[in-house]
Amino acid sequence: MLQALLDSKDFLALTLAHPEQFDSEFSFRLGDHTQVEVWDTGVIVFEPAQNEGKDVVLSCGVHGNETAPIELCNGLIKQLLQQKIIAKQRTLFLIGNPLAINNGTRIIDENMNRLFSGEHSNPPGLVNPERVRAKKLEAYIDRFYTAVADGRQRIHYDLHTAMRASKHEKFAIYPYRPGRAFSGEQIMFLAASGVDTVLFHHEPTTTFSYFSSERYGADAFTIELGKVYPMGQNDMTRFIATHEMFMRLITAKPLELDAFDADKVNLYQVCRVINKHFDDFEFTFATDVENFRSFPKGFVLAREGGQEIKVEHEFESVVFPNAKVPIGNRTVICLIPAVNADVR
């Protein structure tokens, strides 16, 4: 495996050739500047000999059909392995769900991004590939962040693409973080990366980014980088700004960020999450409605169990509507403009 990676510099290809696990860990050096450690399939760490005090996690492929972030991360890994760029921050790349990537599907058995913060081991337990992998990914995050002294900035960008078109092509979800202000610097980093819209979540979740935020105090986000396309069919010119800012972050080049300005970004607050309680749950709007479509107060969003679910605020925007989820799961997130967010 080591020689195959040294020859090809293609970590994604190696991962997909061994989607369940690698037989053993291995490591090697790049020149005199970087120690590279491969912990498992889809798990590679770059440890600079001299680093600038940030511990960066870039994860992708938690959903196997969300290919643009996978190609973006593999491109950065390849540049690092080719020594075209040199890491100056400790960096962990995670390719989340290799089995689903090979399968060309979002999941194998279950939505992995609902299985973190220990949810993977709640009943029925570790019964499918996503649950097993989620537990391993948590362990790799823990190993990476706790291998060095506290006090360093921890960052985790969990990269996705959405199943539908969006009024705002690229957007990020800022996990619930009670007692901690939202970072204006991070929001402006996202804006410089082409991600000009941020949703502030209002409650704990079992997503990957919430896990890193809550457990390790990381500046963590779920980042949606556009729409789902098959591998190799993404227009990577749409990610030039994202690639550039991630490269600057990893190599400790000046980020040259603007000061936080709420007028330069679109900020939303999650006002509620609507879960499914009956099999007959259905939305009243078209199945292909774009993310961030806005509806007025009193509009009937959905019906289930003989009840109507209506818009409660003057206007509410919807993201991730999906009526075809199991009972108990989220069908849609409803948003209102964020006017009093604690951003510093």
UniProtKB/Swiss-Prot annotation:
SUPFAM superfamilies, per database record: Zn-dependent exopeptidases
Catalytic activities: N-succinyl-L-glutamate + H2O = L-glutamate + succinate
Residues that, per the record, bind Zn(2+): H63, E66, H160
One annotated GO molecular function: hydrolase activity, acting on ester bonds
Pathway the protein takes part in: Amino-acid degradation; L-arginine degradation via AST pathway; L-glutamate and succinate from L-arginine: step 5/5
Any single Pfam family the record assigns to this protein: AstE_AspA_cat
Cofactor(s) the protein requires to work: Zn(2+)
Keyword Metal-binding included in the entry's annotation: yes
Protein purpose: Transforms N(2)-succinylglutamate into succinate and glutamate.
Protein known as: Succinylglutamate desuccinylase
GN (gene name): astE
